[in-house]
Every structure is written in structure tokens, then in C-alpha cells.
Curated annotation (Swiss-Prot):
Expressed by the venom gland. One of its GO terms (molecular function) is potassium channel regulator activity. Blocks voltage-gated potassium (Kv) channel and augments neurite extension via NGF/TrkA signaling pathway. Has the structural arrangement of an alpha-helix connected to antiparallel beta-sheets by disulfide bonds (CS-alpha/beta). This is Toxin BmK NSPK. It comes from the Eukaryota. It comes from Olivierus martensii (Manchurian scorpion). InterPro entries: Scorpion_toxin-like_sf, Scorpion_toxinS_K_inh.
Length: 38
């Protein structure tokens, strides 16, 4: 699930993804790609 948060590295996606109720995500194409909680 993509989140429109600009990122350079995956660490920048930690808080935005958690705030969205998901797990830590990866940085893909300059935006955070969050992993849904399973």
C-alpha cells in the first residue's frame, strides 16, 4: 500500500506507516510503500 510520503531511505517510512496502522514499509520510487499488518 503506497503512502504519499517522500522518502530517500526505508527508515523514513517507519513512523508514517505505523501512524497509518501498518508495519514498517520500504522506500519505493521516492514514496513509502507500507506493508499491511497481517
Amino acid at each position: 500500500v503506497g503512502k504519499n510520503v517522500i522518502c530517500i531511505h526505508s527508515g523514513q517510512c517507519l513512523i508514517p506507516c505505523i501512524d497509518a496502522g501498518m508495519r514498517f514499509g520500504i522506500c519505493k520510487n521516492g514514496i513509502c510503500d507500507c506493508t499491511p499488518k497481517g
